[in-house]
């Protein structure tokens, strides 16, 4: 039971004297024992003990970036795919392009997402989230991009 207590105290930074150290030889007098117990003991600094532990800092990871793009032509779809290849999710706003161009962009992005094993999700009428395989898309969206109801230009 005392070993568990010693481990907890050592982890917190307080060290207890081992019982073996308390046992003194018969040759020493009691006065010497009292003087030794009053002397400060060297305790290993907490900072040096932490370097021995294998603890990973949670905040050491780099920041996660989400790219927001508003393509103006079909040629801008390549830039969206380049971000996907570098494992960055992209929010694509297709509100400024014609419906035929928007359809081509979504088709191109759908093929790219399939090839890269990612996902694509519709957020609103003209806004889509395109994510690589290392990003999960979660939330209450209006619908997946399956069917003619999602694409009004497919009437």
Swiss-Prot record:
GO cellular component terms given for this protein: cytoplasm
Keyword hit for Cell division: yes
Location(s) in or outside the cell: Cytoplasm
InterPro entries with a match to the protein in the record: Cell_div_SepF (IPR023052), Cell_div_SepF/SepF-rel (IPR007561), SepF-like_sf (IPR038594)
Gene3D superfamilies, A to Z: SepF-like protein (3.30.110.150)
Stretch list, region Disordered: 16-44
Biased composition range(s): Acidic residues: 16-35
Top-rank taxon, per record: Bacteria
GO biological process terms on file: division septum assembly; FtsZ-dependent cytokinesis
Record-linked Pfam families: SepF (PF04472)
UniProt KW Cell division keyword: yes
Main location: cytoplasm
Keywords in alphabetical order: Cell cycle, Cell division, Cytoplasm, Septation
Self-association state and partner proteins as the record states: Homodimer. Interacts with FtsZ.
Biological function: Cell division protein that is part of the divisome complex and is recruited early to the Z-ring. Probably stimulates Z-ring formation, perhaps through the cross-linking of FtsZ protofilaments. Its function overlaps with FtsA.
Family label: Belongs to the SepF family.
HAMAP family: SepF
Record's protein name: Cell division protein SepF
The species this protein was found in: Acetivibrio thermocellus (strain ATCC 27405 / DSM 1237 / JCM 9322 / NBRC 103400 / NCIMB 10682 / NRRL B-4536 / VPI 7372)
